[in-house]
Amino acid sequence: MIDAHIHLDQYEETLLSSLLQSLPEQDIESLIAVSMNLASSLRTQGIAARYPGLVRPAYGFHPEQPLPPEEDLAALLDWITLHARDMAAIGEIGLPYYSRAEAIEHGEAWDMEPYTRLLDRLLGLAARLAKPVVLHAVYEDAWTVCDLLEQHHITRAHFHWFKGPGDTVDRMISRGYYISFTPDILYEQEIQDLARRYPPELVMAETDGPWPFEGPFTGRTTHPAMVHDVAAAWGALHGYTGSEAKAILTANTVRFYGL
């Protein structure tokens, strides 16, 4: 199988080495390794160079962090352009739903416009480079992101760990956008309902590691092999056998990322 979304650069080095070396025996053939910013992209690039074919890097700027100074953003965009041939996608990019929600909860002012402009620039780069995008866009933010994707004529969009209302789900399905499920599909009703609704041909499996999970994964280090659990849970919702579910999710990921 393929873990369609993981932050390898956030694992401690010794753990990372053992994790990556264990993948063949865990029946994991590849990982889509996303990045947070330029420093993160450089680390992801280094990991991918040590594990060619196994680690497929994506470079970008994660929205749930302070906005970069213009010179830093320009450096990132130039660097991504320079290394476009080496990357599977631009990501992780999107809008800061959780940061905004926290600020509002604490009565703090929040201006979304700079984040929307940043995403617009990153999507423009993806369009120019003809690369797919890995998106952090949930709930009402996903509708805005759909608007931007259409403005840039981007069709290869992967909404990772997606959550959102029915009208947005319908819009995403109509545009052929992909989503991916994490191990929380085993214990979150909201996610299970979405999994039943979203077309099987537009779905992938991910871990978002090293993000920790609850339920049967409480206290465990997040490992790419958990995508097997995701496949089993997702397949059960659709009446697939375990092997059928794994084959479908893997084929979808290969097709989307052109692996």
Task: Place the predicted regions along the sequence by residue.
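Mid-domain alpha/beta scaffold segments of enzyme catalytic cores
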Residues: 1-259
